[in-house]
Amino acid sequence: MDIVEYKSDVWGREVLLGASWDLLWVVIALSFVFIAVHAVIMAVRKREAKPSSDGPKVHRHAAIDRLFHWVMAIAIFVLLITGVLPIIGVEFSWLTIHWIAGLVLTAVVVFHIVRSLFWQDFMSIWVTPKDIKEPFDDSIKPGKYSFAQKSMHAAVTVLTLLVIVSGLVMFALIDTPWWDRTNALSEATLGWIFLAHGLSTLALIGVISLH
């Protein structure tokens, strides 16, 4: 099994083609293993008493945050469907749908970053040294977000930004309603972009499975 794939450019030189999609099956297999192990752990775990519904209700997420979450989720799933299915042999006209979903994802992520910086407590979701002790010390109580939630957010943030940046570079090179296809990047450079896009996509599939 290969991690990366190579090809010969127009001069016969070996250049990167991108990530090997053999890794997709590894990610899928590991995801199923994790889900199965998690299900077993939850089945045998001692269930704690459910908290009372008495008292004031805590408003954890504003409507705009829930809307952002679902628009982002739908965009990512459309990107995965249109990006992965053609790789495994399901042929359909996918490219236009793919880049439209990519632009939607980019727009909602930029909106979320701006809103987080100026209208929310930006640092409340980021992992701090204190948070790392939380899983090992029952006396440490999480705030609004637990260590697991903060870690998941950090992973999704890094991977999503990698997918977006590499995707925008590729988008700038294809035919669109606004510009024609260009060969501005060498095949070697483009191979590194494909590699970054492919590996971050595969990692995002794994993280979504954990989520």
Residue ranges and their predicted role:
Residues 1-210:
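Membrane-embedded alpha-helical bundles that constitute the cytochrome b-like, heme-associated redox core
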